[in-house]
Amino acid sequence: MSLLMISENVKLAREYALLGNYDSAMVYYQGVLDQMNKYLYSVKDTYLQQKWQQVWQEINVEAKHVKDIMKTLESFKLDSTPLKAAQHDLPASEGEVWSMPVPVERRPSPGPRKRQSSQYSDPKSHGNRPSTTVRVHRSSAQNVHNDRGKAVRCREKKEQNKGREEKNKSPAAVTEPETNKFDSTGYDKDLVEALERDIISQNPNVRWDDIADLVEAKKLLKEAVVLPMWMPEFFKGIRRPWKGVLMVGPPGTGKTLLAKAVATECKTTFFNVSSSTLTSKYRGESEKLVRLLFEMARFYSPATIFIDEIDSICSRRGTSEEHEASRRVKAELLVQMDGVGGTSENDDPSKMVMVLAATNFPWDIDEALRRRLEKRIYIPLPSAKGREELLRISLRELELADDVDLASIAENMEGYSGADITNVCRDASLMAMRRRIEGLTPEEIRNLSKEEMHMPTTMEDFEMALKKVSKSVSAADIERYEKWIFEFGSC
């Protein structure tokens, strides 16, 4: 706790008190007194303790003065209420109201007018004066009754609205099943809400059939996530499910797509986490986020935590460029992952939490994290058969010309990643549109019909697209990945 914060809060409290904002001043005074109490526990020197106690007493006296001012102001407000209370306490019977002339006696007319009226006015005018008092009483009584009537009407309207809301809510409460809510006691509400936003509740709608090739990777993910829920009695002891899977490979090979398929097909709670989710500018908050993430995953188990680009969160420790804050986050992540297995000999495998990670830089990952990610699989570039299958998946919504040969196109795409093949298909599908609108004005383009725009994609379009789109992964990169997976892989 900084002394600068205490001094700033004292300044703010005094400024609010001078400006007449006593409620805010009391809040700051109370906060300062609490902060000073905490600070006094940390002070070991007796002389300093005495000094701080004197300061505390002085500020406490100031706070009491502000309290007294607030009480005085409240008493002014309360002094005006008896009149209103007396008005509301008037009986409902009109005969009793007329028999109370006390308010009129408190408001006499000025002296000179009294003399004039007593000297020059006739007795009829004196006889008329009680009628004015009656009018005053009648008007005041009518106001009281009107106020009461309005209050009763407002209450009735509120009750009717509440009843309607309950009726509207009741069908939803019956139809929607009750879902367990994570108990956020002890954690910041904003942190819990931020992590709950990262839970993919809506299906990404990516099926296993939407992913071409990668048979081994799909088989491993099904074994790690799906089978333990189908056969919980089998996956116990030494057969416990894998608690960590690392997908390694060049960019654009389908690592994130596999994670989306896991979220769609495996029916587990899926946390999509990135480095921005687990980092904070406040000291110690990043570690809390990591711990909270795994506690929420255990609560919503069976769960899968997908950490994309994990090298940005848990790179190698002990380097000169490493910051203390990032080191603490890595330590907390490693501790939570080691205790996140949830599938020891006596635990239920259907309540597991699995960490699914993806990276393009496996050589930068810390050794301890590499040990915790028990299965390390290589996601390679698609084979010739995989490229042809990927072409069919990408072009299934397009109309193709009769001369299109997908097998020959796949052969010409050797070394292309899955993302590169998708880009080629997208570029080829736009070729016919480009030819059709060439030389036309914007008005003519707007007047084109849908039939004129949807023309079949030809083999020539693919050849032109292949000339424009080059592969994004070099042979040297592939060799580096294969060397790492040969040394550290666990398929």
UniProtKB/Swiss-Prot annotation:
One of its GO terms (biological process) is cell division. Changing residue 255 to A: Abolishes ATP dependent microtubule severing activity and localization to spindle poles. Disulfide bonds: none annotated. ATP binds at residues 249-256. Signal peptide: none annotated. ATPase activity is stimulated by microtubules, which promote homooligomerization. ATP-dependent microtubule severing is stimulated by interaction with KATNB1. The modification Phosphoserine is found at residues 42, 109, 170. Its main location: cytoplasm. It is found in: Cytoplasm; Midbody; Cytoplasm, Cytoskeleton, Microtubule organizing center, Centrosome; Cytoplasm, Cytoskeleton, Spindle pole. Residues 87-185 are annotated as: Disordered. The keyword Lyase does not apply. HAMAP family: Katanin_p60_A1. Catalytic subunit of a complex which severs microtubules in an ATP-dependent manner. Microtubule severing may promote rapid reorganization of cellular microtubule arrays and the release of microtubules from the centrosome following nucleation. Microtubule release from the mitotic spindle poles may allow depolymerization of the microtubule end proximal to the spindle pole, leading to poleward microtubule flux and poleward motion of chromosome. Microtubule release within the cell body of neurons may be required for their transport into neuronal processes by microtubule-dependent motor proteins. Belongs to the AAA ATPase family. Katanin p60 subunit A1 subfamily. This is Katanin p60 ATPase-containing subunit A1.
